[in-house]
Curated annotation (Swiss-Prot):
Gene3D superfamilies named among the record's database cross-references: 3.30.70.260
Disulphide connectivity of cysteines: none
SUPFAM superfamilies hit by this protein: YbeD/HP0495-like
Xref: InterPro entries: UPF0250_YbeD-like, YbeD-like_sf
UniProt family annotation: Belongs to the UPF0250 family.
Protein's recorded name: UPF0250 protein CV_3095
Amino acid sequence: MSDEKQELFEFPCRFPLKIMGERHDEFVTTITEVVRVHAPDLAEIDVVLRESSGGRFYALTVTVTATSRQQLDNIYLSLTGHPMVKMVL
């Protein structure tokens, strides 16, 4: 058995991130900018917004072309540290 960790993903790969936060006029723009710091090739078509049934929250699905586990970790850390973000899956 190898001591190296086996990767669960083969990079590059398409990877969807689900980002939840309270409804805010700048939510989509702000969160997209945060992700683009780590994935500059993010296209508008890769961003899908859904509103909660009560209209209080947004759920944003952002699909990036991930090039490494480190890149995904950096995106996750940036998003979870942002004040507009309640949860990232």
